[in-house]
């Protein structure tokens, strides 16, 4: 998700249906089903705007038709009480919260306060920065223990704990594993995954295959678009549907396992509200997700 703290990986290609979907205009990939995932927005996308004009910025998001939002650590001038009231007044459901850091120690109390204020039962550790948590197999095993203990703590509080990826979670380690696949196999099944499809593609992987492999363990997907090239180029992001991402294939791969498609921009050099508006319209027009409008 983040380029820096708070200003802030190809497997075999998916064949057939995904490619066919891209060849046909306005193809509703859920045409034979009443089900569609909901469209949400990761608030980090509008971090600069909400710091200076919170209420009107959130109204713009709601007016596009977004069902809900995923929070991050909000600017200091926006209290939990203020944020919660604005979200409620605008009918924006807080379906997920990104933790400021791995929610252990004192960070747990902050996470519980967020959950109470937002009436939200899904907490995601965004995984930033890369650091050494997956560097060696011993580190990985220790990290698994920490994640499992964290998930158990929050489960007792009625909160689901999940993990978010950047590119390194889908790059092979020196000891021969892909971190997120290792975690999927070794973590308690209560831990869910939020797959950032763009960073998976940027890592050189097929995000549709990843989404299929993770199945019900990945109910939330981050949806963003761009060149998906490692380095600074990765941050030259564009509205959903205007880059290299194959979202129909991703939607087919996840099917009804996907609960939320979460639009996100790490960076955008044009008007961010135009970007999130175009992204919303693309998902609606192509029948990939459901919105209010």
List PLM regions with ranges.
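Short, acidic/polar
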Residues: 49-60, 105-114, 206-210
């Amino acid at each position: 998700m983040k380029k820096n703290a708070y200003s802030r990986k190809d497997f075999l290609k998916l064949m057939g249906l995904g490619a066919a979907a891209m060849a046909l205009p306005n193809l509703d990939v859920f045409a034979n089903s009443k089900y569609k995932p909901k469209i949400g927005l990761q608030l980090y996308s509008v971090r600069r705007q909400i710091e200076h004009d919170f209420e009107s910025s959130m109204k713009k998001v709601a007016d596009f038709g977004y069902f809900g939002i995923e929070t991050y650590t909000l600017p200091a001038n926006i209290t939990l009480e203020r944020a919660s009231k604005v979200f409620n007044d605008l009918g924006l459901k807080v379906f997920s919260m990104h933790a400021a850091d791995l929610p252990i120690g004192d960070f747990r109390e902050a996470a519980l306060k967020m959950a109470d204020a937002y009436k939200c039962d899904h907490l995601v550790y965004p995984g930033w920065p890369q650091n050494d948590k997956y560097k060696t197999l011993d580190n990985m095993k220790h990290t698994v223990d920490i994640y499992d203990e964290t998930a158990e703590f929050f489960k007792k509080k009625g909160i689901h704990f999940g993990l978010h990826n950047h590119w390194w979670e889908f790059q092979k380690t020196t000891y021969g594993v892909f971190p997120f696949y290792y975690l999927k196999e070794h973590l308690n099944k209560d831990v869910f995954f939020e797959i950032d499809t763009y960073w998976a593609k940027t890592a050189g992987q097929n995000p549709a295959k990843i989404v299929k492999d993770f199945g019900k363990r990945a109910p939330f997907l981050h949806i963003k678009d761009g060149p998906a090239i490692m380095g600074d180029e990765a941050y030259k992001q564009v509205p959903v549907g205007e880059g290299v991402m194959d979202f129909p294939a991703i939607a087919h791969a996840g099917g009804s396992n996907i609960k939320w498609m979460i639009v996100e921009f790490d960076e955008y050099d044009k008007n961010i509200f135009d970007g999130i508006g175009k992204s919303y319209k693309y998902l609606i027009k192509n029948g990939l997700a459901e919105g209010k409008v």
